[in-house]
Amino acid sequence: MCIRDRFLAVPTQNLASFCKENKSFLTDRPLIACCKGVDQATGLRPSEILSEHSSKIAVMSGPSFAVDISKGMPTALVLASAEPGFLRKLQSDISMHNFRLYRTSDVVGVELGGALKNIIAIACGIAIGAKQGDSARAALMTRGFSEMVAFAQAHGAKEKTLTGLSGLGDLSLTCNSEKSRNFVFGVSLGCQKPFNKNTTVEGVATAFAVSQKARSLGLEMPITSSVSALVEGSASIEEVINSLLSRPTKEE
């Protein structure tokens, strides 16, 4: 790994300001985004924000918790970049025995998989917190994944990417673990208990940004819209549950 490579694990909502404040440190350097989200103010993905500072950009995402990686536990992630040579070198330099990296050119798919699963994790947490049961969680994960695929494909992503580590893999981990900040935040919402406001919950801002974009594209994303409405306080848990359960049945 070259010392010139910059790995950015800054929360997505702070990435633009961080880059502006550290412009001299980042300009024309290889940049690797490790954050998962969509900027609420601009609707931009991390790679789009970084593209203003460098032409050599990659994103790294997938099912992982920092604490597991720090302990050397087996982890598999995905690296994505539009630069094949840069991508292969990164994969070779970073991969280790317990840290496997796969590669793809589908930057959009990798980024949106990592961003959108946070919204669904909040929804699953709400279901568990509101004591709706594991069957409800499974339904939210499955239908939520359909929303993820539809939104990502509308932005040019490949369905194959969403069924891989950065999409389905990350969704499975985040919706089923109390290590997930987004899931735990959802649980707090569901049981109406306070949540540590100093904790980063990327899914909140992402839900707002994605809901707005989905409306402009004419995409139906009821789970995402419900999370957005709940977080902004325009709907109650009871109203959201009733709304989702009263949707017309259709072919899967």
Q: What would you call each of these model-derived segments?
A:
Residues M1:
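Nucleotide/phosphate-binding catalytic cleft detector across ATP-hydrolyzing
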Residues A9-V10, G37, S81, N176, ...:
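Conserved residues at beta->alpha junctions
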Residues N14, F25, I49-I57, P74-T161:
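Internal alpha-helical scaffold of NAD(P)-dependent oxidoreductase catalytic cores
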Residues A33, K56-S61, L101-S105, G164, ...:
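General beta-strand structural signal in soluble alpha/beta enzymes
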Residues K36-V38, S61-V67, E83, S105-V110, ...:
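Glycine-rich beta-alpha junction loops
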